[in-house]
Structures are given as C-alpha cells and as structure tokens.
C-alpha cells in the first residue's frame, strides 16, 4: 500500500511538472509573437529551430554608405593622364581620341589618391567605339611610356565582346571570361564554375548608354559586377603573378577614334 501511494505521488509530481512546462512554453511563444496554428493548418515562416534573422535585401547600385567620391565632378584633381585625351565636361570625365590625335600606345588616366588593397569600386561608363577598361591593383611601366599601366582590368568594349571579363593588361592575358569563375595557378587557369552563358550576360549590357560597374577585390578574390549582375570572378592563387594592391586607372585603347565617359566614381577601402 505504501508503495502504491509513493508511485501515485511521483506520477502527480510528473504531471504537474509537465503542465508547468507547457504553460511556460505557451507564454514564451505568445511573448515572441509565435502561436501554435489551428489543427490542420501549416505553421507560417521558417521551420522552428532554423534562423529567424532579417531577410536578405538586394543591394542598391547607388548605395554608397562607407564610400568616398574620388571624382569631384568638376576637375581632374587627384588624377593624372595625357591632357590631349582627358578632360571634364558636365560632371563627367571624358577620354577622347580623334583621327588627328590617335592613341599610339594604350594610355591611362591614373588615380593618384593611393594604391588600394582590398576595396570596392563603383562607377558608371558610356562609350561609342573601340575598347577600354577599368584598371586596378596595377603598376606603372615608365620604360614603355608615360601613363602606361600593367595589372588587373575589368574589360569593356563597344561591341561587348569582352565587357565584364577579367583581363590582365601586359600580363597573363585573359583570367576569367564573362560568365566564368576561375582559379589561377602558376601553371594553369581552371574554370571552377560557369555563372551564366556569356551571351545571356552580354544582353544585360547597354549600348550607347550608361552602364554601372561594381568591382570587389578582397584578398585574392576578384569580382566584376555590371548592372547588378555577376559577370566574372577569379581566385588568384598564383602568388608570384598576382597583385594584392596597386593603382586605379581608366584605359584609352589604340585603334579608331573613341570617346569614353565616366561618372559617379566611388571607392571604399575594406
């Protein structure tokens, strides 16, 4: 008889503990805005036990928090290039060659404000002919000529055959074609993944209109984004060939007369 009384008392204590736990859990759910759904109804939101942090938002292309303007919209202060090609008009940097003043050797407008290491660069460009590029982590080659750079380049061209790809001016050549993610090693270049087809990405680039460029260089990972779309990315594991910092610049390419326009230049050091 005493044994039965002890068992009954233990059962009663267990039942009371379960009731208290259930009531506590219900209050906690209500305090957090979570309630059990009615029978037969699926719960809303992510499954319990998973993260409930803020959702992922698209980054606006004109988001410049933490960036600094590297073009004042009026002058070429802080920039260095051949004055016969470069000027400022209507808050826009213009690089222009003519039949009378052709570009004989690829020449660059160089930013003298530093040699960024890890950074993000945003800008807009428009062009009417030939080929150009955004140069970064680059070095000067005075033996070749004044205003000549060697280094990574976000390629742009009027026909958009190469626009968006990663090229190395006066170096290893094509490092990641448009639509590719690559790994660069001393003896070979490998495709890690195909992002999208080159033609699909080409269709996202505007002709005779403004295009937005976003370059991210972080460590040995180099990323090119045009008009909000990932164009090319490379992981440069070639320790002897890669650059981890260097000059920024814009290219005027040899060939027929051309006009390159640049505006809204923003830089953020990471």
Describe the role of every protein-language-model region:
Residues 1-13:
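Bacterial N-terminal signal peptides that target proteins for export
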């Amino acid at each position: 008889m005493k044994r039965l009384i002890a068992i009954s008392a233990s059962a009663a204590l267990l039942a009371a503990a379960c009731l208290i736990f259930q009531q506590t859990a219900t209050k906690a759910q209500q305090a957090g805005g979570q309630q059990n759904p009615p029978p037969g109804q699926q719960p809303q939101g992510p499954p319990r036990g998973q993260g409930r942090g803020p959702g992922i938002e698209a980054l606006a292309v004109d988001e410049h928090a933490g960036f600094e303007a590297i073009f004042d919209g009026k002058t070429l202060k802080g920039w260095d290039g051949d004055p016969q090609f470069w000027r400022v008009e209507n808050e826009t940097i213009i690089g222009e060659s003519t039949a009378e003043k052709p570009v004989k050797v690829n020449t660059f407008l160089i930013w003298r404000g530093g040699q960024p290491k890890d950074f993000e660069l945003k800008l807009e460009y428009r062009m009417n002919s030939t080929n150009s590029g955004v140069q970064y982590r680059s070095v000067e080659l005075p033996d070749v000529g004044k205003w000549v750079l060697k280094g990574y380049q976000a390629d742009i061209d009027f026909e958009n055959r190469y626009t968006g790809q990663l090229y190395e001016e006066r170096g290893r050549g094509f490092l990641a074609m448009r639509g590719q993610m690559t790994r660069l090693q001393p003896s070979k270049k490998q495709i890690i993944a195909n992002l999208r087809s080159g033609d699909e990405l080409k269709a996202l680039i505007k002709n005779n209109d403004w295009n937005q460029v976003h370059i991210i260089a972080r460590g040995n990972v180099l990323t090119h984004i045009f008009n909000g779309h990932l164009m090319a990315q490379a992981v440069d594991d070639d320790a002897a060939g890669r650059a981890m910092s260097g000059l920024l610049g814009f290219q005027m390419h040899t060939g027929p007369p051309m006009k390159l326009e640049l505006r809204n230049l923003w830089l953020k050091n990471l």
